[in-house]
Regions:
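Hydrophobic small-molecule pocket/channel-lining residues, especially in calycin-type beta-barrels
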Residues: 1-183
Length: 183
């Protein structure tokens, strides 16, 4: 099944557009910050892994909080906060991304659309109660990004940040060993 899901790169007929999310392909580690309604910040180590899928017509990822490494630490008492996957598919007809998030741990399922806005990526959806939600990829560099989930009860006039991730790209095995890689 994994062999059928995996793709080595983007589909040639949409390779340029696929790089909006394709630039994240690889493994990342960082910090998860939850902004509780009472104003208290809760933090945990986190990881995310992006890869090409479905003949290069999708980018799929897996988000894990706390990270698998942190779960091995006997001093970490945080239970699993999330362990889910996102499937992102580019639609050339609308020039939008159709995105589905699934977290079986929390029984959380979100469908949204995504697009490039300036230097950022904005994904939007509404919850069952009508709350407008955005997931933002911002401060994007080849080796880091900042991810924000924010919500608005007044259709975007004011926003409340609920979750943030601060990620750094993990070094590949060849980078860790000092070997150079020719592409």
């Amino acid at each position: 099944m994994l062999e059928a899901l995996y793709a080595a790169g983007p589909a040639p007929d949409r390779a340029r557009q696929m790089m909006l999310y394709g630039r994240f392909v690889g493994s990342w580690e960082g910090r998860f910050v939850y902004h509780a309604p009472d104003g208290v910040l809760r933090e945990a180590p986190s990881e995310v892994h992006f890869g090409w899928a479905l003949e290069g017509r999708a980018v799929q990822d897996v988000w894990i909080v706390p990270s698998r490494h942190a779960r091995q630490d006997p001093n970490v008492s945080t239970p699993g906060i999330l362990y889910g996957t996102t499937l992102r598919v580019y639609d050339p007809r609308s020039d939008l991304w159709h995105i589905t998030w699934i977290d079986p741990l929390r029984q959380d399922y979100d469908r949204m659309t995504g697009r490039k806005v300036g230097d950022d990526i904005v994904q939007e959806f509404r919850t069952e109660d009508g709350t407008r939600c955005q997931w933002l990829f911002t401060e994007i560099t080849p080796s880091s990004f900042h991810w924000i989930r924010r919500e608005s009860k007044d259709d975007g006039k004011t926003w409340n940040v609920r979750v943030e991730f601060f990620f750094q790209r993990k070094a590949t095995e060849s980078e860790r060993s000092g070997r150079s890689v020719t592409l």
